[in-house]
A protein has these predicted regions:
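Alpha-helical recognition/docking segments in bacterial nutrient-uptake
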Residues: 1-9, 68-176, 180
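N-terminal helix-turn-helix DNA-binding module of bacterial transcription factors
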Residues: 1-67, 340-342
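Short beta-strand segments enriched in small/hydrophobic residues
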Residues: 24-27, 61-77, 87, 177, ...
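Generic beta-sheet signal
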Residues: 38, 150-152, 165, 189, ...
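Hinge/beta->alpha junction and helix N-cap segments in small-molecule ligand-binding domains
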Residues: 56, 74-83, 102-110, 163-173, ...
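Periplasmic-binding protein-like
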Residues: 123-131, 185-190, 220-221, 241-252, ...
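Flexible loop/turn connectors
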Residues: 239-342
Length: 342
């Protein structure tokens, strides 16, 4: 007999009582053939003991008719993840789908599993993850889901379909632009070490310098994507580089804003003394003083291609490649110029 409770039992309660995963409960409810008989019996017994009843959303999950897509996102207040989320919602709406988002401060196996529980209970047809940290790939590969999954951005597990902007290429474009302008030493202010995109951009910077036969000034300074961290890195860069400082590639535009202020306070003019290139092309970049040369990411294309890739998986089509890479674009403004004469 069902025990009295202040709330109706959930799929998570059934999984806990039966000693199985929520994915297994979902498969039993959907009469999936790949469930052992003894496991199926344990789940059905738990359902009877708890008095669990599927709601319409959970039932729709099995038939894939909710027309709702789940999104798990971390660091969603930052420009890149926030722009990606907006693009996903726009693209999903254009296809007649709603988006249910779970925002996480940090993505781990535990937090991702809890987010999946919530989305499964609500009923979704598929999942998109916007989690750029390197730990996201490990978390994704350790969990199985009862629906298709697509990663958006650089954090991807092996074998998981996804869409990303070519961060490595973007960094090579930025660094190459400074080298083409005559600079022979290009410094770098990197993003957080645990972000895959920051690592890819730093690797692209190194690759561009190596292709030109130039030793990169190691290690690069780093920040947390904020203008304040860029400002502090800029102050340190002025001291460390001294007269060798003529060009800086900054891993995002907001940190570049801080670097520009640090240079200005040190009496260095941009671009006359030091050229600066950012990354992202945030809406404010063209209004920086001076307007910022930067690398533009096409978040609209990322959203559109991600939704198409996920819907192809949901509907059993394989028309989209498993991994889609979108090329960034160098936007040249007045924060860069040829290297000043010695």
């Amino acid at each position: 007999m069902a025990q009295p409770s202040l709330r109706p039992p959930t799929m998570t309660d059934v999984a806990r009582r039966a000693g199985v995963s929520h994915q297994t409960v979902s498969r039993v409810l959907g009469d999936h053939p790949n469930v052992r008989d003894d496991t199926r019996a344990k789940v059905l017994n738990a359902i009877g003991e708890l008095g669990y009843r599927r709601n319409s959303s959970a039932r729709a999950l099995v038939t894939r008719r909710t027309r709702t897509l789940g999104v798990v996102a971390s660091n969603s207040t930052l420009y890149g993840p926030a722009s990606t989320l907006f693009a996903l919602e726009e693209a999903a709406r254009a296809k007649g789908y709603l988006v249910s988002t779970v925002s996480l401060r940090k993505l781990t196996v535990k937090t991702l599993s809890e987010a999946l529980d919530r989305l499964i209970e609500g009923g979704v047809d598929g999942l998109l993850t916007v989690a750029p940290q390197q730990s996201a790939a490990a978390a994704l590969t350790e969990l199985s889901t009862p629906f298709p999954v697509v990663t958006v951005g650089s954090g991807s597990g092996a074998g998981i379909p996804g869409v990303t902007v070519d961060q490595h290429l973007g960094a090579r474009l930025a660094t190459g632009h400074l080298l083409d302008a005559g600079h022979r030493r290009v410094w770098h202010v990197a993003g957080p070490e645990d972000w895959q995109e920051a690592q890819d951009r730093a690797d692209g910077w190194r690759a561009a310098l190596a292709a030109a036969g130039i030793e990169p000034p190691e290690p690069p300074l780093s920040g947390d994507w904020s203008p304040l961290s860029g400002y502090r890195a800029g102050q340190e860069l002025v001291v460390r580089a001294g007269r060798e400082l003529t060009a800086v590639f900054v891993a995002n535009d907001q940190m570049a804003l801080g670097v520009l202020r640090a240079l200005r306070e040190a009496g260095l003019r941009t671009p006359h003394d030091v050229a600066v290139v950012g990354f992202d092309d945030i809406p404010e970049a063209e209004f920086f003083a001076p307007p910022l040369t930067t690398v533009r990411q096409d978040f609209t294309a990322v959203g559109r291609r991600s939704i198409t890739l996920l819907l192809d998986r949901i509907e059993g089509r394989e028309s989209s490649p498993p991994r889609i890479v979108i090329e960034p674009q160098l936007i040249i403004r007045t924060s860069t110029s040829p290297s000043p004469p010695p």
